[in-house]
Amino acid sequence: MEVLHSTDATFTADVVNSDVPVLLDFWAPWCGPCRMISPILDEIAAEFSGKVKVVKINIDENQATPAQLGVRSIPTLVLFKNGKAVATQVGALPKNQLANFINQNI
């Protein structure tokens, strides 16, 4: 499954109403660590296909959702399960640690 790009307008449909857990990445194009983990998120999306959906929200273009969830720095990864945020990771992680973060929380 490919990484899905969401917006404030589509957040509820893409994340809250998802039938599988969602790893939500808050990012911005100017953020170096965000760009660094982007290919890792692509790999995670492929490896966890069918088990976890990976969704990205650009905080420069969509400010309501990160404000609502209290995002203060990026990258911030929030894992949603059954429409609720169950775990948060602030900062970039290597792929193996990100996979462990997902497995521990789904």
Curated annotation (Swiss-Prot):
This protein's name: Thioredoxin
Is Lipid metabolism one of the keywords? Answer: no
Which species? Pasteurella multocida (strain Pm70)
| The keyword Disulfide bond appears for this protein | yes
Per the database record, which ranges form the Thioredoxin domain? 2-106
Top-rank taxon, per record: Bacteria
Function text: Component of the thioredoxin-thioredoxin reductase system. Participates in various redox reactions through the reversible oxidation of its active center dithiol to a disulfide and catalyzes dithiol-disulfide exchange reactions.
Entry's SUPFAM superfamilies?
A: Thioredoxin-like
Which cysteines link up through disulfide bonds? Answer: C31-C34
GO cellular component term of the entry, any: cytosol
Q: Which Pfam families match?
A: Thioredoxin
Alphabetically sorted, this entry's keywords are: Disulfide bond, Electron transport, Redox-active center, Transport
Of which family is this protein a member? Belongs to the thioredoxin family.
The secretion signal range is none
Q: GO biological process: any one?
A: cell redox homeostasis
GO molecular function: any one? Answer: protein-disulfide reductase activity
